[in-house]
Swiss-Prot record:
Its main location: cytoplasm. GO terms for cellular component: cytoplasm. Its EC number is 2.1.3.3. Keywords: Amino-acid biosynthesis, Arginine biosynthesis, Cytoplasm, Transferase. It catalyses: carbamoyl phosphate + L-ornithine = L-citrulline + phosphate + H(+). The lineage of its organism: Bacteria, Bacillati, Actinomycetota, Actinomycetes, Micrococcales. It is an enzyme of class 2 (transferase). It is found in: Cytoplasm. Transmembrane segments: none annotated. This is Ornithine carbamoyltransferase. The keyword Cell membrane does not apply. It comes from Renibacterium salmoninarum (strain ATCC 33209 / DSM 20767 / JCM 11484 / NBRC 15589 / NCIMB 2235). It comes from the Bacteria. Belongs to the aspartate/ornithine carbamoyltransferase superfamily. OTCase family.
Length: 311
């Protein structure tokens, strides 16, 4: 059966551990696994489709596919018939006959679901409006490197709780058995359905979920502090108003002082210093942001290898 990765919970706890452990191995030995190379490996091309602009996602997938022995085929916005002159379902049926895997950075989660439903090759969510599961694999890999493990750690996210990063922190974090806290204004908290899914997964793993409007409560004693931009793509006209709303949720020195003394700081980038995160924090000694950015490469390589070898 073809395996896809559309949302963080598409990997169960054991599978998530397998992918992260493989990522650590690939970080030490980049060419350890090459599922797209060699005799009998099948197709070598991976379609990487971008409906949204990207730096880290584009570079990490392109480099990772090459290191896995494959060839990345980058398809930018407006460079195909996808979604306007040809249906998603028909596009999937064509691509599956030509490529080994489909990676898609897009807007609507439902589009990814339709692509996967009509594809016999793995489909990977490289970001949607609802989830950013590849980023969370990189984040968990980074935490595991610096903390030695994941289970039982407290991970706090401050800021816009209604965005894709908050959703993925909830789902990926509890899958790893972590205690996940989201601090956000009342009108910007995660959707109830996502919280419900996270609670269900937490019941399996011993993790927990706290959603609050109190950033001090959320930051207190945390092992990991994370944030994301307050102004996502398409929200540029709201920059001033959103900056005022989210100001109490900034990841600054005061927030960091409330966390555990050895807490690490995450930000998926791009970062806006002086807004969601202080320069002294992102550029300070507790920041692991640059390891986090690099780990997109290793985590996604592990994910692609894991999916292809099981599909």
């Amino acid at each position: 059966m073809t395996r896809h990765f559309l949302v963080d919970t598409d990997l169960n706890p054991q599978e998530q551990t397998e992918v992260l452990d493989l990522a650590l191995q690939l970080k030490r030995n980049p060419y350890l696994r090459q599922p797209f190379a060699g005799v009998g490996a099948g197709r070598k091309t991976v379609a990487v489709i971008f409906d949204k602009t990207s730096t880290r996602t584009r570079v990490s997938f392109a480099a990772g596919i090459s290191e896995l022995g494959g060839t990345p085929l980058i398809i930018g916005a407006g460079e195909s018939q996808l979604g306007h002159k040809e249906s998603i379902a028909d596009t999937a049926k064509v691509l599956e006959r030509m490529v080994a895997t489909i990676v898609w950075r897009t807007f609507a989660q439902v589009g990814l679901e339709e692509m996967a439903a009509n594809s016999k090759v793995p489909v990977i969510n490289a970001l949607s409006d609802d989830y950013h599961p590849c980023q969370l694999l990189a984040d968990l890999l980074t935490i595991k490197e610096h903390k030695g493990g994941l289970k039982g750690l407290t991970m706090t996210y401050l800021g816009d709780g209604a965005n894709n990063m908050a959703n993925s922190y909830l789902l990926a974090g509890v899958t790893a058995g972590m205690h996940v806290r989201i601090a956000a204004p009342a009108e910007y908290q995660p959707d109830e359905s996502v919280v419900r899914d996270a609670l269900n997964r937490a019941d399996e793993t011993g993790g927990s979920v706290l959603v609050t409007t109190d950033p001090r409560l959320a930051a207190s004693g945390a092992d990991v502090l994370a944030t994301d931009t307050w102004v996502s793509m398409g929200q540029e006209d709201e920059k001033a108003s959103r900056a005022e709303i989210f100001k109490p949720y900034a990841l600054d020195a005061a927030a960091l002082a409330l966390a555990a003394a050895d807490a690490v700081v995450l930000h998926c980038l791009p970062a806006y210093r002086g807004y969601e995160i202080a320069a002294e924090v992102i550029d300070g000694p507790q920041s692991v942001v640059w390891d986090e950015a690099e780990n997109r490469l290793h985590a996604q390589k592990a994910l692609m290898a894991w999916l292809v070898e099981r599909s």
